[in-house]
Amino acid sequence: MKKVSIQVCISNKQNDVPIRIQSAKKLVLYCLQHWEVHTDQVYIYFLDDESLAQLHDEVFSDPSLTDTITLPIDSPGTSSQPHILGEAFISPKAAIRFLKDRAEDSDLLYEEISRYVIHSLLHMLGYDDQTPEERKKMRVKENQALCMLREKHALLSD
């Protein structure tokens, strides 16, 4: 991987799924490089369900559980210094709930959490998922990124 000067800040404040910080940084850097995104900083927070639901309530006045919250900060192409792409707040436990009995397969579990990170990065880049067409377009980009990351052995891991 070519050296890029993007500060990827990862915080793991949950105990449901072990997350390797370096693995998460690698995933983010590969995606941003693949998409030719130029930014100075991006923040990814792995939270427990309670913390994410509380944030969901604070930001969107909706206390329900969710898998990820993305807060884009600086749009790609803007010239702020430093350029901060955004913040993503992700619940690894949501992947366990989604996969149900298949969550015992750690490869599937980490692939699903990787999808959440990719999904959040796409939101930071301006992709939306409010309509069926937008969801389809986003899912295609997510799947392309997952394929690229699989080839490079850069999916999240424990």
Swiss-Prot record:
The keyword Oxidoreductase does not apply. The lineage of its organism: Bacteria, Pseudomonadati, Chlamydiota, Chlamydiia, Chlamydiales. Binds 1 zinc ion. NCBIfam families: rRNA maturation RNase YbeY. Keywords: Cytoplasm, Endonuclease, Hydrolase, Metal-binding, Nuclease, Ribosome biogenesis, rRNA processing, Zinc. It comes from the Bacteria. It comes from Chlamydia caviae (strain ATCC VR-813 / DSM 19441 / 03DC25 / GPIC). Its EC number is 3.1.-.-. It is found in: Cytoplasm. This is Endoribonuclease YbeY. Its cofactor is Zn(2+).
